[in-house]
């Protein structure tokens, strides 16, 4: 399902999170439930208080239901999550006040989890495989292209870019997806994994919105 490319990198400080992966997913899902929903198709951006800090992003953490994509009169859309290519290890770096810290997150695996959640929330059927080779099942691929994160006196500033591909008998489309976040007052490096999850979830929200509209 996932393919990861490893490269040799210059030694940098290793940044590990105290919370387990399950704890991080649980935190993000709880934050999503507690957040006021917003349209993930809106260009207006999103602001909220998260863990006491002002969180600013270009897309909401919790998307409002889109009645058009949830219309029960329309045949169920089916997708197969095919391949998700992770960032190279040397790209997973947080520049924190002059220090380079390795962000220990499998971006592809985290994206898969959140994308599956978002697609199912939109009434889309997510298949474990396409063994029957149905030409009407949309194959979903994504490759992460770049990630940039900086901590300064104001807080944390992160950007993420990936290329989404959706293909079936009727279409073969590619979309470059960009998302960003600013966390004002961020100074606890142990929370880096949590905020990286939120950034990846934003990309999953955007990807799910694109897929649901095709």
Swiss-Prot record:
Keywords: Cell outer membrane, Lipoprotein, Membrane, Palmitate, Signal. A lipid is attached at residue 18 (N-palmitoyl cysteine). The keyword Membrane applies. Residues 1-17 form the signal peptide. A lipid is attached at residue 18 (S-diacylglycerol cysteine). Disulfide bonds: none annotated. GO terms for cellular component: cell outer membrane. It is a lipid-anchor. InterPro entries: MapA_lipoprotein. The keyword Cytoplasm does not apply. It is found in: Cell outer membrane. NCBIfam families: outer_memb_MapA. This is Outer membrane lipoprotein MapA. It comes from Campylobacter jejuni subsp. jejuni serotype O:2 (strain ATCC 700819 / NCTC 11168).
